[in-house]
Amino acid sequence: MYYPVSSILIEFLVLAIVEKQDSYGYEISQTIKIVADIKESTLYPILKKLEKAGYVTTYTQEFQGRKRKYYTITPAGREHIPFLQAEWNTYKDHIDGIIEGSLRK
């Protein structure tokens, strides 16, 4: 099942992925596609945004004769994860509240 995702959730997923292991764009997109139907055209601007914000850095490495651009998390990226985790938890709590009937307007 695929769920709609916001760019902030994609940022969180990207940082969570590269926190565990350096990854290249296609690998990141395939991991996210396990739960969300995203396109590379959505992912790459977010990767660039994370790089510009200083949350990830990149390096190239050759693989089977081709260069791959790998993303690695920075200390600032690690520090940003708890904020994104809190945002995600709030979102989940609101969804659960609606489903359980405890959150209404």
What are the residue ranges of the model-derived segments?
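Amphipathic alpha-helical dimerization/coiled-coil segments
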Residues: 82-105
